[in-house]
Amino acid sequence: MRRDARPFFIRRLRDGFEEWRVRHFLEPQFDSVGPGLKVAYVSGVELWGANIHAGHDLHLRAARGNMIRLATWDSGGRVGEIRIGDCVLISPGNQIISSEKITIGSNTMIASGCYISDSDWHDTYDRTAEHDKHAPVVLEENVWLGTRVIVCKGVTIGENSIIGAGSVVASDIPANVIAVGSPARVIRPLDPAQEIRKRSDMLADRDGLQREMQQLNRYLLRENTLFTWLRSLIAPTRKD
């Protein structure tokens, strides 16, 4: 489809149903999660294991065929842990898998297809066991990972830093820099004279933002009718 052909009231009903699914099926899978959890495509989010925690206003934007997976594993007496701060955005196709501990700071944005793990999962020579091939991962506040970034065990990425698309982060990245490559290297610092606005600034008035989005959707869908929506499902045209 080229556009959303649903009338506004159908969109509202669908959104309400998805919010119910989040409360009824997804929230109980977290050990703790703050208010304001928003999920696009609930069926595309998978939580596995214990010790998964998130702050307020976590946004999970899964998509059909592009699941988000948050998983912790029991590695023989040591259970992994995932701690996600406030106002974090996780995009489609992300896998965050912990054997020890992964910490994601508030306001962090993770683009599509990233992989974050605190373990190699198998020893170099004894490939039947993990042994000591694990170390905590920390993404400090307001980190931005580009598309298909891989973050390896033992890495800390400093506050505000940006990792370019396709990079492999195998060692620590300092705060307030841009890093790219495989392995990721710092290419330049951020400009200290520039103000950095964060997701928490946008979400400070959560209810007001929600009202604005509803008004925008009402405007964008204003010409859609139940008949034209049903027709677009049964007999779509080039305009649909």
Show which residues each predicted segment covers.
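Short-chain dehydrogenase/reductase
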Residues: 162, 178-180
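Domain-scale signature associated with acetyltransferase and cell-envelope carbohydrate enzymes
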Residues: 1-117, 140-141, 175, 184-188, ...
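Short glycine/proline- and charge-enriched loop/turn segments
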Residues: 123-130, 195-201
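A short, glycine- and basic residue-enriched loop/turn
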Residues: 136-137, 154-155, 176
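Beta-rich strand-turn-strand
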Residues: 95-101, 148-161, 167-171
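Conserved catalytic-core motifs of eukaryotic protein kinase domains, centered on the activation segment
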Residues: 120-121, 127-129, 173, 189-190
